[in-house]
């Protein structure tokens, strides 16, 4: 029996990668609550300058991640996914350590860019599990895996705020580096992968990758869906606290209310993703995707008409439950329409589209709210998601007709 034929305990790998995604999600979000404060501590003064630099250090990570993801995806298809997980966890740990030592804003900006270049733990974890799990359990497995990053992202800001209050800003970066190093150790000792390295000559080029896809047009539509999901999520982020303040009026605990309303979609996604993923394995992920997109539209529109923060919280909870199905459904359809040989690149391309959405979403939300007010953001976002639902339905219908 060759090494590549030795059975893999994919359930153990799923558990360990879930922990890795949880730690990575927590590590990234640990520093988010005080990022503008750290920018100020590095010598940036003035309201407009602080806003500009805070936006730059936030977005540059996603921009460089979008650029680097296809390269790392190709390397994963050549060398294996485990080594990419190790490279990502250790690289991010070192960069986080250096961030805590930054002396000026330019050093910090460069390190944030480097963080984007060296990232990629979660897409590589998705690719690893997608190539190991039985096809009929892909939806459940990828849905479960997605809850790891969501859980970490939910707990990270809370933990980061508490740590910053008790120990100061710089020590949080050192703690974050330690968390990422633990992720590296877990991956090194407990994840197993049977992978036969592929020479550069044997690697499929981009045209061959496209030719090997069962339905290239559908795969492109799935990439666009990923982008729009992130645009829809990100467009609301810049205005959420201000919108909650407008709804709540003069209350003393506006930060708490805003934080709770910001986090409820994540809690709902945490509960819904594995269950809807399992349902998708039974009835088809394409049905889950279209229904979840339509429900998202129907929930976004009334958000522009709410009168109290609690009405907004309820709608965002329901939206989170629907959104919890979206990315796992996209990833499952990518698994169905590609081969293990190119899984690393397909998931990395998907990550690039996700990163572009992470950058453009907040810009779109800020621009719309500046011109037309907070409530218009929800209506425009609903329109974008509706377009995506129609586009995705049309792509999936063409695929079904082609099969028939």
Curated annotation (Swiss-Prot):
Its main location: membrane. It is found in: Cell inner membrane. One of its GO terms (molecular function) is transmembrane transporter activity. The chain crosses the membrane at residues 19-39, 56-76, 90-110, 113-133, 144-164, 171-191, 222-242, 254-274, 288-308, 317-337, 376-396. It is a multi-pass membrane protein. InterPro entries: MFS (IPR011701), MFS_dom (IPR020846), MFS_MdtG_subfamily (IPR050497), MFS_sugar_transport-like (IPR005828), MFS_trans_sf (IPR036259), Mutidrug-R_MdtG (IPR023692), Tet-R_TetA/multi-R_MdtG-like (IPR001958). Keywords: Cell inner membrane, Cell membrane, Membrane, Transmembrane, Transmembrane helix, Transport. It holds the Pfam family Sugar_tr. It comes from the Bacteria. GO terms for cellular component: plasma membrane. HAMAP family: MFS_MdtG. Belongs to the major facilitator superfamily. DHA1 family. MdtG (TC 2.A.1.2.20) subfamily. This is Multidrug resistance protein MdtG. The lineage of its organism: Bacteria, Pseudomonadati, Pseudomonadota, Gammaproteobacteria, Enterobacterales.
């Amino acid at each position: 029996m060759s090494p590549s034929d030795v059975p893999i305990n994919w359930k153990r790998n799923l558990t360990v990668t879930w922990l890795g995604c949880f730690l990575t999600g927590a590590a990234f979000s640990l520093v988010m609550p005080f990022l503008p404060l750290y920018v100020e501590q590095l010598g940036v003064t003035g309201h407009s300058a602080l806003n500009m630099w805070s936006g730059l250090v936030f977005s540059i990570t996603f921009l460089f991640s979008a650029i680097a993801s296809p390269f790392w995806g190709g390397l994963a298809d050549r060398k294996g996914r485990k080594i990419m997980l190790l490279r990502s966890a250790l690289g991010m740990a070192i960069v986080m350590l250096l961030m805590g030592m930054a002396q000026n804003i330019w050093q910090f900006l460069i390190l944030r860019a480097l963080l984007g270049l060296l990232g990629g733990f979660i897409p590589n974890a998705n690719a690893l599990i997608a190539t190991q799990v039985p096809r009929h359990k892909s939806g459940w497995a990828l849905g479960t895996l997605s809850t790891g990053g969501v859980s970490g992202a939910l707990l990270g800001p809370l933990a980061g705020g508490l740590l910053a209050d008790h120990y100061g800003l710089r020590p949080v970066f050192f703690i974050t580096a330690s968390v990422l190093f633990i992720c590296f150790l877990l991956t090194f000792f407990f994840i197993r992968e049977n992978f036969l390295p592929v020479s550069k000559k044997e690697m499929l080029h981009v045209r061959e990758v496209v030719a090997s896809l069962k339905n290239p047009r559908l795969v492109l539509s799935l990439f666009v869906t990923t982008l729009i999901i992130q645009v829809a999520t990100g467009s609301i982020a810049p205005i959420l606290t201000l919108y909650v303040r407008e709804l709540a009026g003069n209350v003393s605990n506006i930060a708490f209310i805003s934080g709770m309303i910001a986090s409820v979609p994540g809690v709902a996604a945490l509960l819904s993703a594995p269950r809807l993923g399992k349902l998708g394995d039974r009835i088809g992920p394409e049905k889950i995707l279209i229904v979840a997109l339509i429900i998202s539209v129907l929930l976004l529109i009334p958000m522009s008409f709410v009168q109290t923060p609690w009405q907004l919280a309820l709608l965002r909870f329901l939206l989170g439950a629907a959104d919890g199905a979206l990315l796992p459904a996209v990833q499952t359809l990518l698994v169905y329409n590609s081969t293990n040989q190119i899984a690393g690149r397909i998931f990395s391309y998907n990550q690039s589209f996700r990163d572009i959405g992470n950058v453009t979403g907040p810009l779109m939300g800020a621009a719309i709210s500046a011109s037309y007010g907070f409530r218009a953001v929800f209506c425009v976002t609903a329109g974008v998601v509706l377009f995506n639902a129609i586009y995705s339905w049309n792509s999936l219908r063409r695929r079904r007709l082609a099969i028939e």
